[in-house]
Regions:
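Pan-zinc metallopeptidase signature
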Residues: 132-234
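Non-catalytic, well-ordered alpha-helical scaffold segments
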Residues: 63, 67, 104-111, 144-148
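Post-HEXXH active-site segment of zinc metalloproteases
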Residues: 59, 74-108
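Short, conserved phosphate-binding/catalytic loop or strand-edge motifs used
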Residues: 88-90, 130-135
Length: 234
């Protein structure tokens, strides 16, 4: 199987064979780099620009495509997602924080599924580590309770669960030197996501609500948690 001419190496064929019947997309949607699979990072046939992810090493490319497909798989199985009230536009702080929150929580069941196949993403993780180290070292500390304060805390929780112990130790020390308050919130968020059962939609939804409420963003429809099984919002 290929995407835009690039081979999707093992274990992708086995992964695709296992999940294709549960997805509301086609084989062509994957191989053509479509918006249905890759969102705003899709391939535009009318443009000479290729998506950045197409330059990834073979193993990381296979992981990346599996990652995007697993997002769709989770929605098809009723795992929750994040929305916001109609008063908040796409570029609002609520949209940004909500998107980061969804990624943080949903990545737990997502990685739980992908890990069963033995995908690797060394290049992606190295890039994330170097980018985070540079950004944290040079960035100004966001004010307490601001949207960027929440995104920094969410990033803390996420990075603490995916980086190697040595890499995380470096970043954690930078976080501590920058803002103990962000560290405190990040630790609480991490505790919630690491204690939930990633295979149960109800428990993932509960964890998402807890994280949202912990940040105080459950008022005025600022961040809504959507149960994709019935459309109910919390």
């Amino acid at each position: 199987m290929k995407v835009l001419g690039r081979n999707l190496v093992d274990p992708f064929p086995e992964f695709w064979s296992d999940i294709e019947d549960d997805l509301f997309i086609t084989y062509y949607d994957v191989t053509s780099g479509s918006e249905e699979v890759f969102g705003d990072q899709h391939f535009d046939s009318g443009s000479s620009v290729t998506p950045r992810w197409l330059t990834l090493p073979d193993e990381d490319l296979a992981y990346h495509v599996a990652h995007e497909l697993t997002h769709l798989l989770l929605k098809s199985k009723g795992f929750p997602s994040v929305g916001r009230g109609v008063r908040y536009p796409e570029n609002s702080a609520e949209a940004i924080v909500g998107s980061d929150l969804e990624e943080l929580v949903v990545h737990q069941p997502l990685e739980w599924i992908i890990a069963q196949y033995g995908f690797t993403r060394d290049f992606i993780l190295d890039t994330m580590y170097e980018g985070a180290k540079s950004g944290l070292s040079s960035g100004n500390v966001p004010g307490y309770g601001t949207p960027w304060f929440f995104t920094w805390a969410i990033r803390y929780a996420e990075l603490s669960t995916i980086l190697s112990p040595l890499e995380w130790k470096v970043l954690k020390n930078i976080y501590r030197s920058k803002s103990p308050d962000i560290v405190s919130l990040g630790e609480e968020l991490r505790d919630i996501i690491t204690k939930m059962d990633p295979g149960v939609p109800d428990l993932v939804l509960e964890a998402m609500v807890l994280c949202r409420n912990l940040m105080g963003l459950g008022v005025e429809d600022r961040i809504l948690i959507i149960d994709n099984r019935n459309g109910e919002m919390f």
